[in-house]
Curated annotation (Swiss-Prot):
Keywords: ATP synthesis, Cell membrane, CF(1), Hydrogen ion transport, Ion transport, Membrane, Transport. F-type ATPases have 2 components, CF(1) - the catalytic core - and CF(0) - the membrane proton channel. CF(1) has five subunits: alpha(3), beta(3), gamma(1), delta(1), epsilon(1). CF(0) has three main subunits: a, b and c. In this bacterium the a and b subunits are transcribed but do not seem to be translated, thus the ATP synthase consists of the alpha, beta, gamma, delta, epsilon and c subunits. Pfam families: ATP-synt_DE, ATP-synt_DE_N. It is found in: Cell membrane. It comes from Moorella thermoacetica (strain ATCC 39073 / JCM 9320). NCBIfam families: ATP_synt_epsi, PRK13446.1. It is a peripheral membrane protein. PANTHER family: ATP SYNTHASE DELTA/EPSILON CHAIN, ATP SYNTHASE EPSILON CHAIN, CHLOROPLASTIC. This is ATP synthase epsilon chain. InterPro entries: ATP_F1_dsu/esu_C_sf, ATP_synth_F1_dsu/esu, ATP_synth_F1_dsu/esu_N, ATP_synth_F1_esu_C, ATPsynth_dsu/esu_N. GO terms for cellular component: plasma membrane; proton-transporting ATP synthase complex. Produces ATP from ADP in the presence of a proton gradient across the membrane.
């Protein structure tokens, strides 16, 4: 049965190298799925959860903060700004980050960079989802 070679890479390290049956990633227009024999594709990613479905294990989740996905017939390469495997995520820290971002967006202090606060909220939510905390 066909499979995909998945690599998730940040500027600092290779976060995940795995053989996958399928990959689901957070495209800018919604989540997209990649199966073996996929047509060539390059697309930007937003903050969210990349799900690697494996044959020998159910799945592995990685929180990404954005980047690009390149897919081909037998491989998927994700170049992410940042990425954390589910087991690396500090859930309490991510909850606090989400609460801080929500509070800033709710209170709207003078000089608030709304886009930056919204991006922080999306990153925190992605971490919590990848860790299975929400």
């Amino acid at each position: 049965m066909a499979s995909l070679n998945l690599e998730i890479i940040t500027p600092e390290r290779v976060v995940l190298q795995a053989e996958a049956a399928s990959v689901i990633a957070p495209g800018i227009q919604g989540y997209l799925g990649v199966l073996p024999e996929h047509a060539p594709l390059i697309t930007p990613l937003q903050a969210g959860v990349v799900t690697c479905r494996r044959r020998e294990r159910a799945e592995e989740r990685v929180a990404v903060s954005g980047g690009f996905l390149e897919a081909g017939p037998d491989q998927v390469i994700i170049l992410a700004d940042t990425a954390e495997r589910s087991e690396e995520i500090d859930v309490e820290w991510a909850r606090q980050a989400r609460e801080r971002a929500e509070r800033r967006l709710r209170e709207r202090p003078p000089g608030l960079d709304v886009a930056r606060a919204e991006a922080a909220l999306r990153r925190a939510v992605a971490r919590l989802k990848a860790a299975g905390a929400i």
